[in-house]
């Protein structure tokens, strides 16, 4: 009879898409010479402790030292997998022969200490961009993202704060969502690891099939939670979607303490660091718990505690994955940590009512781009589609174009109903203080038109040299009033080579481009941002003042693309 643990292992092998190596002989050399794994895929090895431990998670530390083909060495954390089993995972973009030796804080444990083996990393031959080009990094100019091999990466994220919870069932519902997002053009998914912003502390509605990730009574990890989570997270990667890992919401730090928060991060690093992941320190770093009796004191305490954890995360970040932090309402990650230089890129949160959120988001974006140290800036939480029964697709496409044409290397979308994966069976749209932001379910929300239309925008930009573009607000007429400034038009490009301009429905009937170079001709076309349709314009040159204009024949928003000939 097949045992439940065997079912999970079989499914893990079926769905994860990893190169796994296993041995049933404790204390032997677990890896035989000649094992192979494709570049950027995960090599995993399992070991059994030969010594008894009352509390394996807290009583023993397990690591592995990897020797690269050029002889350099790097140590990586291993992890407790439950019972007496410990594992390590590893991946590399480099090709060649690697060797490893395991290290235990208990040197007398022959099952965990000084186990040796070799394996070979071979070229990946598939078409998954994350495996072909490698994990995501900050570009040399500190303004956009690239893959490890330098290929530009135009970020389009989606927000699944409760995406690992069992109310988004594995495999059918999770795979439905993943397929939908990949087809629409998304390439990153941000999610919490069970300790989500919805519900009370350690709320059981955020469990997966195996419970919560953290056993508060025992002060340790629940490895079985991560067994179920692995299926989902590896499937994201297999589908070309970057896992943006947010282990916990900010207010948990006062409940768990910094020591346990560091241990949680080290465990996440050990299990998912070999994936092309992005690390987000925590969600809404300084936001107090909803019903806290001491909110004024909690925020500064949370910033101090998470700043300590950030320094630790930077220290143990053995794969060099990008690190950011998700800020509370109305600010950026720079303001949520004591040393912003430890962040690789900035995230901003500007609120959820479009007419207020867009101007605030643009202000935060410009402030961060002008601050030191330089780093890319993402609108990471802004005016979720459908939240408060507002912010529909017209708002979403304007947020996208406002973001990318104002200097951001992408955009993170969100839809109310999806962020918490509320359903009729598992309603989760009411916060602990009693506030509801809307009634819709994820089964409806994933079909909101805004998710399609931001994907249309990303696909259109991906055909251009978007990573060379800089904001150029001087290329369009200024708004007639300060109130309209954030809502009319945005322009970016490369002088003399490329211009991309968004004209909203509030722009004038006469669409005008300024500052055209006298010696340059452009081939121009409009994009209808709601459906991607192209409307040819033809050859464009400025007049003696460098001005060109055309009377619009469509009152809806339009994107003008001008490519030098």
Give the location of each predicted region.
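Secretory targeting signals
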Residues: 1-7
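The substrate-binding groove and active-site-proximal loops of carbohydrate-active enzymes
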Residues: 159-169, 211-224, 249-259, 282-302, ...
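Catalytic-core region of carbohydrate-active enzymes that cleave or remodel glycosidic bonds
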Residues: 340-425
């Amino acid at each position: 009879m097949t045992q439940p643990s065997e079912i999970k292992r079989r499914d893990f092998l079926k769905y994860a898409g990893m190169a796994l190596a296993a041995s049933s002989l404790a204390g032997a050399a677990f890896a035989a010479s000649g094992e192979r794994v494709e570049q950027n895929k995960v090599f995993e090895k399992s070991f059994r402790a030969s010594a008894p431990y009352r509390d394996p998670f807290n009583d023993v530390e397990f690591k592995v030292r990897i020797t690269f083909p050029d002889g350099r060495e790097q140590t990586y954390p291993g992890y407790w997998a439950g019972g007496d089993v410990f594992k390590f995972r590893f991946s590399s973009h480099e090709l060649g022969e690697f060797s490893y030796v395991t290290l235990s804080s208990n040197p007398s444990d022959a099952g965990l200490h000084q186990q040796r083996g070799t394996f070979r990393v071979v070229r990946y031959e598939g078409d998954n961009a994350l495996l072909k080009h490698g994990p995501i990094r900050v570009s040399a100019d500190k303004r956009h993202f690239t893959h490890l091999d330098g290929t530009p990466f135009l970020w389009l994220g989606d927000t699944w704060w409760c995406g690992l919870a069992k109310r988004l069932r594995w495999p059918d519902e999770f795979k439905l969502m993943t397929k939908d997002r990949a087809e629409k053009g998304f390439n990153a998914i941000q999610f919490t690891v069970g300790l989500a912003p919805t519900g009370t502390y350690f709320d059981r509605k955020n469990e997966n099939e195996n419970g919560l990730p953290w056993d508060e009574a025992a002060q340790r990890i629940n490895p079985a939670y991560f067994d179920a989570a692995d299926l989902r997270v590896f499937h994201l990667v297999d589908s070309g979607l970057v896992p943006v890992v947010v282990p916990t919401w900010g207010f948990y730090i006062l409940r768990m303490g910094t020591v346990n928060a560091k241990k949680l991060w080290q465990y996440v690093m050990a299990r998912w660091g070999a994936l092309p992941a992005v690390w987000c320190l925590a969600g809404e770093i300084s936001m107090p718990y909803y019903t806290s009796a001491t909110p004024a004191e909690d925020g500064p305490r949370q910033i101090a505690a998470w700043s300590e954890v950030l320094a630790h995360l930077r220290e143990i970040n053995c794969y060099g994955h990008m690190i950011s932090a998700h800020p509370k309402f109305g600010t950026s990650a720079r303001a949520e940590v004591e040393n912003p230089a430890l962040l690789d890129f900035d995230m901003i949160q500007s609120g959820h009512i479009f007419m207020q959120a867009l101007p605030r988001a643009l202000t935060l974006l410009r402030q961060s781009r002008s601050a030191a140290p330089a780093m890319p800036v993402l609108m990471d939480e802004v005016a979720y589609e459908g939240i408060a029964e507002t912010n529909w697709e017209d708002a979403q496409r304007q947020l996208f174009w406002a973001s990318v044409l104002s200097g951001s290397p992408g955009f993170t979308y969100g839809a109310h109903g999806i962020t918490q994966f509320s359903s009729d069976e598992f309603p989760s749209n009411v916060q602990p203080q009693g506030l509801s932001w809307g009634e819709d379910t994820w089964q409806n929300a994933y079909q909101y038109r805004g998710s399609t239309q931001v994907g249309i925008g990303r696909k259109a930009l991906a055909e251009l040299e978007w990573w060379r573009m800089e904001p150029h607000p001087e290329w369009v007429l200024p708004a007639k009033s300060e109130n309209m400034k954030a809502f009319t038009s945005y322009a970016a490009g490369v002088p003399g080579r490329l211009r991309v301009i968004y004209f909203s429905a509030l722009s004038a009937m006469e669409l005008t481009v300024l500052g055209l170079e006298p010696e340059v001709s452009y081939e121009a076309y409009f994009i209808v941002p709601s459906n991607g349709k192209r409307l040819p314009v033809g050859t464009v040159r400025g007049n003696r003042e460098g001005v060109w204009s055309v009377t619009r024949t469509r009152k809806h928003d339009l994107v003008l693309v001008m490519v030098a000939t």
